Every structure is written in structure tokens, then in C-alpha cells.
Amino acid sequence: MLAMMLNTTLSACFLSLLALTSACYFQNCPRGGKRATSDMELRQCLPCGPGGKGRCFGPSICCADELGCFLGTAEALRCQEENYLPSPCQSGQKPCGSGGRCAAAGICCSDESCVAEPECREGFFRLTRAREQSNATQLDGPARELLLRLVQLAGTQESVDSAKPRVY
């Protein structure tokens, strides 16, 4: 009788331990565990936006040099696929803000949001001009400065309601 109770108790403990430990595994950990990510090379994030000209910065953020950033719009839907890929990625040129990277002219994005950032203005205009062949829709200096100023004003007067889709 004692052996049967001991056997039942031991089986119950083993099953409880198995149930507890199986709940601790994450499905999207990188190969080799989370510490192995420093050894892995970062790949370019998925292309997104009109004509695939942009790059994903987060699950709902798509930015392109010439087009700006799309937040929570149809152009950024493809970026949700990044959550299911096993290797880490990085978009943008140089680090900016608090954990973000320069995404477009004057815009700094992290994986959660974008803000106007003056230090991200450098280099984008030259890069855009080098890429364009002869595009009549490209903005000239004064128009570009006005648009950039409007983006900066929108970033400083951003409302609390961030659930609405936005395009920067």
C-alpha cells in the first residue's frame, strides 16, 4: 500500500514538473538562445511599401528614403512577417534618438514609433539625389524644406491618440 502511494505521488510530481517546464519555452527565440544573437550577423529587414522601396522598422512601420514613413497603414502590413523570421534584422543608416535609427530625411524610428530628428537630415538628400535618374516629382530645396518643417511640427504636436494609421 505504501509503495503504491509513493509511486502515485512520484508520478504526480513528475507530471507537475513536466507541465511547469514545458510552459517556459518561447517559440521565436534565435538558434542558440538569446545570447547567441550577438554572434549572428544582422540581415537587412524585409522590403515594404510602394514598389518594395521601403524597409521595415517594426511590426507596423515601413520607411523609404524617398517616401517617408508609413505607420499602421497597408504599406506596413508586410512588416508583421518579421515577427516570424528566426534571425534578427536592422534597417536604417545611423543610430539616433533612444534606440532608433535614421529612417528617412529628418525621421528617426525605433521598432515601436517614429519621431522627427534633426540629426537624421544629413546624408538623405544627397542619397536621394544620387538615386534619382530624372524624376520630375522630386521636390526642390524650398519645397523639401517646407515639407520637412511640417513633419517636424507634426512630430512635436503629436496627439495622444497613436492608434490611428499615420504617414510621415
Swiss-Prot record:
Highest taxon above the source species: Eukaryota
Subunit record text: Interacts with vasopressin receptors V1bR/AVPR1B (Ki=85 pM), V1aR/AVPR1A (Ki=0.6 nM) and V2R/AVPR2 (Ki=4.9 nM). Interacts with oxytocin receptor (OXTR) (Ki=110 nM).
Ranges that cross the membrane: none
Gene transcribed to yield this protein: Avp
Pfam families: Hormone_4, Hormone_5
Residue positions the entry lists as glycosylated: N135
Region forming the signal peptide: 1-23
Record-linked SMART domains: NH (SM00003)
Glycoprotein listed as a keyword: yes
Matching Gene3D superfamilies: Neurohypophysial hormone domain
Subcellular location: Secreted
Site for Important for agonist activity on V1aR/AVPR1A, residues: G32
InterPro entries associated with the record: Neurhyp_horm (IPR000981), Neurhyp_horm_dom_sf (IPR036387), Neurohypophysial_hormone_CS (IPR022423)
Keyword Ion transport carried by entry: no
Protein name stated in the entry: Vasopressin-neurophysin 2-copeptin
Keywords: Amidation, Cleavage on pair of basic residues, Disulfide bond, Glycoprotein, Hormone, Secreted, Signal, Vasoactive, Vasoconstrictor
Positions carrying Glycine amide: G32
Family: Belongs to the vasopressin/oxytocin family.
Organism: Rattus norvegicus
